[in-house]
């Protein structure tokens, strides 16, 4: 059955691709317009927004292929530069939730005298991280940072698109301060107000998260409140590319 499905998909794909591009685009547009013409405009919008989610999934999948396994957003948004710019050579840096290791690799290459360790509980992603071209000052560890971290003390902790996956974010940040003894926390999270469609999605009851595992996508005020509640102080913060990038420091009065 699976083999038949693949053959059928290849046949349909061939027929589709030999059609002129303008015809394909017109057909797709027409189908989306028809799908949106619900008696209730809100229901029509719901359908379109869910279609957009599927399209975004396909775009991201193709973007990964285009980038030979690494999403072009790393290169185009240059958010790695934020982490590098706020660190110094010689620091011990722990990248929590390192994924494929792209950020940790950039930091380790930029600062050869630093010890950089990435920790993640996803074995598949860690396997890819370990087989990449890594500098000698970079290592990867399998583990759940909500339970334990590699022995410190650490100078800086990187949390790139991690906090939004945690339920008790304040408790997690407090625990990290105790387990790592780091004074610097470089944090990147998605911003709820990145598009006008986010509050519209919430109003319509359509999922507005960029990842179904996200427990929150912060407003600016929510982010600042959680950082303050954890005992950290925001040293610098900026919003770029629909995200919050922050350099936070441990407040010794709350240690």
Positions of predicted regions on the chain:
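Activation segment
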Residues: 149, 166-170, 196, 212, ...
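A short SAM/SAH-binding and catalytic strip from SAM-dependent methyltransferases
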Residues: 158-167
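A short glycine-rich, Lys/Arg-flanked "PGG" loop and its adjoining helix->strand segment in the class I
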Residues: 171-184
């Amino acid at each position: 059955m699976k083999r038949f499905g693949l053959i059928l998909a290849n046949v349909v794909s061939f027929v589709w691709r030999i059609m002129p591009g303008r015809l394909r685009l017109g057909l797709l547009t027409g189908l989306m317009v028809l799908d949106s013409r619900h008696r209730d405009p809100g229901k029509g919008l719901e359908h379109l927004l869910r279609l957009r989610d599927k399209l975004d999934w396909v775009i991201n999948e193709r973007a990964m292929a285009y980038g030979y396994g690494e999403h072009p957003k790393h290169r185009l948004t240059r958010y790695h530069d934020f982490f590098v710019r706020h660190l110094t050579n010689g620091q011990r840096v722990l990248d929590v939730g390192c994924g494929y290791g792209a950020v940790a690799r950039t930091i380790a290459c930029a600062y050869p005298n630093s010890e950089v360790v990435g920790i993640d509980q996803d074995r598949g992603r860690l396997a890819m991280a370990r087989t990449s071209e890594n500098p000698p000052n970079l290592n990867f560890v399998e583990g759940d940072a909500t339970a334990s971290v590699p022995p410190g003390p650490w100078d800086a902790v990187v949390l790139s698109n991690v906090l939004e996956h945690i339920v008790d974010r304040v408790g997690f940040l407090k625990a990290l301060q105790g387990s790592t003894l780091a004074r610097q926390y470089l944090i990147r999270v998605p911003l709820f107000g990145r598009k006008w469609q986010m509050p519209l999605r919430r109003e319509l009851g359509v999922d507005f998260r960029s990842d179904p595992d996200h427990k929150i996508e912060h407003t600016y005020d929510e982010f600042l409140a959680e950082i303050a509640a954890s005992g950290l102080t925001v040293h610098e913060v900026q919003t770029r590319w629909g995200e919050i990038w922050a350099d936070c420091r441990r407040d010794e009065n709350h240690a």
